[in-house]
Amino acid sequence: MRVILKEDFINLGKEGDTVDVKDGFARNYLLPKGFAVFSNKHNIDIFNQKRRAILKRQETRKKIALELKAKLDKVSLEFVMQSNDGGKLFHSINSLNIADELLKLGFEIERRKIDIHYGTLKTFGIYDVTIKLYEGINAVIKVEIKREEKKKSLKKSKSVAKEV
């Protein structure tokens, strides 16, 4: 089924593009959610009239993405995590954790735009994480996972002696 996109979609197309998608994807997701319209003569004429505004909007998004990339390339995140004696983390780091930390720094990034090359981060170390900002514009941030220092308990162990 041919549809015209009303929004940019990663791996599908940009706003105003006419794309071929499976019928079920169009009927069950794109059309009901308002992300696309049927590709017919009337809708094509409407989008041709809006083409200049769409291109201007895309240029604005690209400019904003480049500015955001310059800021994000300087960012490094640090997570202090607990682990077992073998060095395996009790809780892995995923895109939601990274998005929350970026939000604390003032960057509102959707978690689906964060690409952790390893799926989730489960061991200590420094990792490069890619953030997809716009078509062809990606920022790379450093994520460091450090070990939380274990607190040594100062309690004296009591020994219980039983007489037999």
From Swiss-Prot:
GO biological process entries: translation
GO function term, MF aspect, one: rRNA binding
Pfam families: Ribosomal_L9_C (PF03948), Ribosomal_L9_N (PF01281)
InterPro entries documented for this protein: Ribosomal_bL9, Ribosomal_bL9/RNase_H1_N, Ribosomal_bL9_bac/chp, Ribosomal_bL9_C, Ribosomal_bL9_C_sf, Ribosomal_bL9_N, Ribosomal_bL9_N_sf
CC terms in the record's Gene Ontology section: ribonucleoprotein complex; ribosome
Signal peptide: none
Superkingdom to which the source organism belongs: Bacteria
UniProt KW keywords: Ribonucleoprotein, Ribosomal protein, RNA-binding, rRNA-binding
Task performed by this protein: Binds to the 23S rRNA.
Family the entry assigns: Belongs to the bacterial ribosomal protein bL9 family.
Entry-linked NCBIfam families: L9
Name of protein: Large ribosomal subunit protein bL9
Species, as recorded: Borrelia hermsii (strain HS1 / DAH)
Taxon lineage: Bacteria, Pseudomonadati, Spirochaetota, Spirochaetia, Spirochaetales
